[in-house]
């Protein structure tokens, strides 16, 4: 069994991620050979992330580190892992670029021509909890995608 889930820093204060930890524990206890693929957030969700942080004409986003991955990279890695022998463990995956969360969202909005101002707010919430510097990035070795933000944005605009 190969299971795609969110990248989780344990212990976590984020309710969404606590639910993901519970799912992983069920898989581990099942006795079925498995590989859990923990992915950072997808680049394709940047629009909804910006929307969730919008407060009037500003977008409040944590300055914690962020390393989003393109869905095409996730699909390629997932297929590779699913076809390999189960590891009975975890594979972490992330995009090739790491930067503060607020800077990536600002870069995205600027590329869109969106006039909203992105404000670095250490108290900004994400999935119901506070984000610290390393909550959303792999802390150990991770398998990195190949598609950069610029390449992903170019492709996404061409497909629109």
Indicate where each model-derived feature is located:
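Structural signature of the Rossmann-like NAD(P)-dependent dehydrogenase/reductase core
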Residues: 1-3, 36
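Amphipathic terminal alpha-helices
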Residues: 134, 139-160
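Oxidoreductase cofactor-interface core, primarily capturing Rossmann-like NAD(P)-dependent enzymes
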Residues: 8-117, 121-127, 133-134
């Amino acid at each position: 069994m190969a299971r795609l889930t969110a990248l989780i820093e344990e212990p976590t204060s984020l309710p969404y991620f606590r639910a993901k930890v519970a799912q992983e524990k069920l898989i581990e206890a099942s006795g079925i050979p498995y590989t859990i693929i923990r992915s950072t957030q997808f680049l394709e969700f940047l629009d909804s992330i910006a929307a969730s942080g919008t407060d009037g004409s500003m977008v409040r986003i944590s300055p914690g580190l962020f390393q989003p991955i393109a869905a095409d990279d996730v699909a390629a890695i997932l297929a590779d892992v699913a076809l390999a022998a189960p590891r009975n463990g975890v594979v972490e995956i992330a995009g090739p670029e790491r930067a503060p969360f607020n800077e990536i969202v600002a870069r995205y909005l600027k590329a869109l021509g969106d006039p909203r101002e992105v404000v670095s707010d250490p108290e900004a919430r994400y999935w119901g909890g506070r984000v610290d510097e390393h909550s959303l990035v792999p802390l150990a070795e991770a398998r990195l995608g190949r598609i950069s933000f610029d390449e992903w944005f170019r492709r996404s605009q061409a497909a629109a």
